[in-house]
């Protein structure tokens, strides 16, 4: 039935990788089952034979989905099926997209969809690497125009050694989690989180990962040769040299002048005017001119003008030299009622960042295929349309916002205190209020400032910087603190976050081949100088965490009780702890070892909660007098509280000196009385006496008279 299944297995570090095609999803353009040990991902590629006429962009979609059956689980929730992509799934989809997108020809506009589905998982083997390898293999056998294949490698830094594709357990002890992807001759993408590693250590890890993945690229080439899919007969459309020349004649000189306007919105207005003038002239010359084609050529001309100017050594778009950082403005404590806040402005990029402290109950529970964990540090990045002077949809975060938030979080994670050192859940929100390049790195700077303003004892200030590159032949220029236009028109986006001591996050996206180790070294060194300049300005505003947290933040008080007393504090069905929280206005969390954390914005409330917990957990002593309330009345006596919720029985004979017939004649429910503990039996039942307590507290007049004689 299955005519020619092709299977390719090879060793990759400590793992066995298997690629298989020809059995599943045979109607797709290409489909590969990729496995790394017991982690298996099924990747399909479907490409349309024809592009939409006049389409001026490349419609590539990458979908990554984790099925819970892969881990032998049933989804939680009401519907019991997978829903919208999780944050982790979105980040993995971006990880796949970034290195493959630049490998399609610029003129290729046919729709391509990649769908990767995790179908089996070993908790020790993260599925992202094998997904990237499987995607590369599927594209390599699809027959479509693709300048791959790519490889992918995860690199750890454990005990001073670089480790290829460490397991999830090994990563817990690693100072580095770096993913690098590239072709045989070039690195295309780097994504990493580090614990203050040096520039040299980071570069060594990138080179190591790229060298190691050559075995993957070789295996995929052999796999593709065996499958031998016929290549599409796609040919790039011929360049319209006549239209190119005419647009250059009409607009080039004007664009050179326009790109000397340093203010972004004024420059954009002028460029739009030039574009409108060009359209008007071309339509008057030929009514049938394709304006979409004109737009594409005009944009390419813009790119040529800017790149030529930078390579020639001229000042940049906003007038800066290549290694200059834009003007900085740093403010903290800008919002009165938030727990911590900052406003970080770098040129025309601005981030308003807030930090909020919560209890451990506020931690995010992440239920992934590899197990459940709690995240006590949350960082959310918002990019509203007004920050670039536009209108647009406002709603759920898009892929880009999720990716930028994760990058900023990676930059800060290394300096965050442990939950034992600072028992709070911390949520940071970065609102990008202006944007002209490098907003994710502005978020890193703003987050560092807001955390210090909130009194979070981070280990050091962290700053981030975005670098760019323009390369023509052997000539190249590395740019510090790139603008949005320089990012768009350049060959590399290189973001580095770190402290004065080292790098905490590195993200790199390269659009061309030929980026050498030397170029990356220059970029890293130039980024170090820019980062230290920004840190100096930040430290002038605030150089360490405030000594005290905000008066509006919850204060967490910790106490310890015996673990066998936990049930007393919780009560039947949680009744006792619920009442404690409601009546004292606090939030109380109890751990299995008896550690209790009480969160309250007012000190008096916390003290009252502590007093009541101490009362509940205290041991009742025989012979001691306690004040309690009558809880129930029965024929043979009354049940009275002793310590907190503990109750004891006052027998009818122990209520008063004289004989009584009805308990209700002397006691009412809710009445406060003093009782003396007579006995605690083996079962923990407490016997109380009101009459002995009264006798001890109020000696009889006769006895007093006798004493007086």
Swiss-Prot record:
One of its GO terms (cellular component) is cytosol. Pfam families: KH_1 (PF00013), PNPase (PF03726), RNase_PH (PF01138), RNase_PH_C (PF03725), S1 (PF00575). Residues 623-691 form the S1 motif domain. GO terms for biological process: mRNA catabolic process; RNA processing. It comes from the Bacteria. Belongs to the polyribonucleotide nucleotidyltransferase family. Involved in mRNA degradation. Catalyzes the phosphorolysis of single-stranded polyribonucleotides processively in the 3'- to 5'-direction. This is Polyribonucleotide nucleotidyltransferase. The lineage of its organism: Bacteria, Pseudomonadati, Pseudomonadota, Gammaproteobacteria, Vibrionales.
């Amino acid at each position: 039935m299955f005519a020619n299944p092709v299977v390719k297995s090879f060793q990759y570090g400590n793992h066995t990788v298997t690629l298989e095609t020809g059995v599943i999803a045979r109607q797709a353009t290409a489909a590969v089952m990729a496995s790394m040990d017991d982690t298996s991902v099924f990747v399909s590629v479907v490409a349309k034979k024809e592009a939409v006429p006049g389409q001026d962009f490349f419609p590539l979609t990458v979908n990554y989905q984790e099925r819970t059956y892969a881990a032998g689980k049933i989804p939680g929730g009401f519907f019991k099926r997978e829903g919208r992509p999780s944050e982790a799934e979105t980040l993995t989809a971006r990880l796949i997209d970034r290195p493959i997108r630049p490998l399609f020809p610029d003129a290729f506009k046919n729709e391509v969809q990649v769908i990767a589905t995790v179908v089996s998982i070993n908790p020790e083997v993260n599925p992202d690497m094998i997904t990237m390898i499987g995607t590369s293999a599927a594209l390599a056998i699809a027959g479509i125009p693709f300048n791959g294949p790519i490889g992918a490698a995860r690199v750890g830094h454990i005990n001073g050694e670089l480790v290829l594709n460490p397991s999830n357990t090994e990563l817990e002890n690693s100072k580095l989690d770096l993913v690098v992807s590239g072709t045989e001759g070039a690195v295309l993408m780097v994504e990493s989180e580090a614990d203050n590693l040096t520039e040299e250590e980071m570069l060594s890890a990138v080179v190591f990962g790229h060298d190691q993945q050559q075995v993957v690229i070789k295996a995929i080439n052999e796999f593709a040769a065996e499958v031998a899919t016929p290549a599409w007969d796609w040919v790039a459309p011929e360049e319209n040299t006549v239209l190119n020349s005419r647009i250059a004649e009409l607009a080039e000189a004007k664009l050179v002048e326009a790109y000397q306007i340093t203010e972004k919105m004024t420059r954009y207005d002028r460029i739009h005017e030039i574009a409108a003038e060009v359209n008007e002239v071309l339509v008057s010359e030929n009514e049938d001119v394709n304006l979409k084609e004109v737009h594409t050529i005009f944009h390419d001309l813009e790119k040529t003008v800017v790149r030529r100017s930078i390579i020639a050594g001229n000042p940049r778009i906003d007038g800066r030299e290549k290694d200059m950082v834009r003007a900085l403005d740093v403010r903290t404590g800008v919002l009165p009622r938030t727990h911590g806040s900052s406003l970080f402005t770098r040129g025309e990029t601005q981030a308003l960042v807030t930090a909020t402290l919560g209890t451990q109950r506020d931690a995010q529970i992440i239920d992934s295929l590899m197990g459940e964990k709690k995240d006590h540090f949350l960082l959310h990045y918002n990019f509203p349309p007004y920050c670039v002077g536009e209108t647009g949809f406002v709603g759920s975060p898009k892929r880009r916002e999720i990716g930028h938030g994760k990058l900023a979080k990676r930059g800060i994670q290394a300096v965050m205190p442990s939950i034992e050192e600072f028992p709070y859940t911390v949520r940071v929100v970065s609102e990008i209020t202006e944007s002209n390049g490098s907003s994710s790195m502005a978020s890193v700077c703003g987050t560092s400032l807001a955390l210090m303003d909130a009194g979070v004892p981070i280990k050091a200030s962290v700053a981030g910087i975005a670098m760019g590159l323009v390369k023509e032949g052997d000539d190249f220029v590395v740019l510090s603190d790139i603008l949005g236009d320089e990012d768009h028109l350049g060959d590399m986006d290189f973001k580095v976050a770190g402290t004065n001591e080292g790098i905490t996050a590195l993200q790199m996206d390269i659009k061309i081949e030929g980026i050498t180790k030397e170029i990356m070294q220059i970029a890293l060194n130039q980024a170090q100088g820019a980062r230290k300049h920004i840190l100096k300005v930040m430290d002038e505003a605030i150089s360490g965490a405030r000594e005290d947290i905000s008066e509006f933040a919850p204060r967490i008080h910790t106490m310890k009780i015996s673990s066998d007393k936990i049930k007393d504090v919780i009560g039947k069905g949680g009744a006792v702890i619920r009442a404690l929280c409601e009546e004292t206005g606090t939030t109380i969390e109890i751990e299995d070892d008896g550690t209790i954390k009480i969160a309250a914005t007012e000190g008096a409330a916390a003290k009252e909660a502590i007093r009541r917990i101490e009362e509940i957990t205290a041991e009742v002593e025989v012979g001691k007098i306690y004040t309690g309330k009558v809880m129930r009345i029965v024929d043979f006596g009354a049940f009275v509280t002793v310590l907190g919720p503990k109750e004891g029985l006052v027998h009818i004979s122990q209520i008063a000196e004289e004989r009584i017939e009805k308990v209700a004649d002397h006691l009412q429910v809710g009445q406060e009385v003093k009782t003396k503990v007579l006995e605690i039996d083996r079962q923990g039942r407490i016997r109380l006496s009101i009459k002995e307590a009264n006798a001890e507290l109020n000696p009889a007049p006769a006895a007093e008279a006798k004493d007086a004689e």
